[in-house]
Structures are given as C-alpha cells and as structure tokens.
C-alpha cells in the first residue's frame, strides 16, 4: 500500500465510525508516513506511536486502527497517535 492508499483507508474508516481525521496536515502526514514505514518493515500498518514487541499475538492489537482507539477517543477526544478524532 502506498501513503495515499493508507490515507484513503483511514478517511473511509473515520467516516464509517463518525470520527474525523487530524486536520493538522503536518501531523497527519507524519502518522501516515509512520504507518507506511511500519508496513514496509513489518508487513502490517502498526500504529507508529506504540511499541512493537515482535510477538504477533500481542502486536496485532496495534494494527491501525488499534484495539485501543475507541476508548481513547471517548476519553481524550482522539486516539493516542492523534490520527482519529471525535467529531
């Protein structure tokens, strides 16, 4: 997947979940690049803000969108990496 595809999928997911995507283009591009880098290195778009352990059973939880993002958005208004935001 290239960066445009990752961004497109992220936007589609956000729309489906009634979230928004970070409006700060610089931060958004930083996160998308991090997702792409992790895909190239590990084969999955792991959240660039979380630690990859090498134990896939554990690490699968941090494939974007990670299992934690909905609770984080509810609590803070955004996920840890600030890709997804509450509207």
Where are these regions (language model features)?
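Long, distal/terminal scaffolding or interaction modules
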Residues: 1-87
């Amino acid at each position: 997947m290239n960066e445009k595809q990752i961004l497109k999928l992220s936007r589609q997911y956000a729309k489906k979940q009634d979230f928004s995507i970070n409006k700060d283009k610089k931060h958004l591009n930083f996160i998308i690049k991090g997702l792409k880098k992790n895909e190239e290195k590990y084969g999955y778009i792991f959240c660039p803000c979380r630690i990859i352990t090498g134990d896939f059973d554990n690490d699968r939880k941090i494939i974007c969108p990670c299992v934690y993002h909905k609770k984080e958005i509810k609590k803070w208004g955004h996920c840890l990496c600030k890709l997804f935001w509450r509207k």
